[in-house]
Amino acid sequence: MSEDILIPKWVWILVSLAIVLGLGFWVSPLDRDGRPLLLSPDVKAVEDYRRSLVAWHAKLAELDGRIARVLSNDYGGDLFSQSSDGQKALNETLQVLNEIDQTAAIPAAVPARELALNVANTTLIAAQSALIWVSAPTPANLSSAQQALDAAHTTMSILEASQWDETK
């Protein structure tokens, strides 16, 4: 004798509802307080761009530290390593700058985009100045590179103070 197990419709509805709610909870982005965001297309575009800005900021901050290391005397006379690290920092800064420039910004994010481009540009100038100093280590070139790095720090602090950057 084979007895069929009958599952009522309300059980199927509850299980389906639990699965849909679980998926929604799992894939929904969270705001800074950990609450799920209700995403309309506009809100999603703003949130996506904000996350891009935070990622660019983190990468530029890392590159800033690497440029500062190139300007320090931590290499013990190893010109090849110092030059190589400076060149890598320059190339990666250029990649971030291109990524910022090529990412479409929603109208509300245009000022934040300009801030990010400014930070990337000043970081690129600092990387170039560091490489000039590595190639010709004169006090004037070191001073110029330090000034460029200070300018990058200043623009970075302006980006950090903006409402778009939640890393603060």
Stretch-by-stretch model annotation:
Residues 24-31, 130, 134:
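Structural signature of transmembrane alpha-helix termini at the membrane-water interface
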Residues 9-28:
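Hydrophobic membrane-insertion alpha-helices, especially the h-region
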Residues 27-48:
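Ser/Thr/Pro/Gly-rich low-complexity linker/stalk segments immediately outside membranes or between
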Residues 1-11:
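Short, low-complexity patches enriched in S/T/P/G
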Residues 1, 16-19, 94-99:
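Mid-chain, structured segments of secreted extracytoplasmic proteins
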Residues 41-168:
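Alpha-helical segments in soluble extracytoplasmic regions
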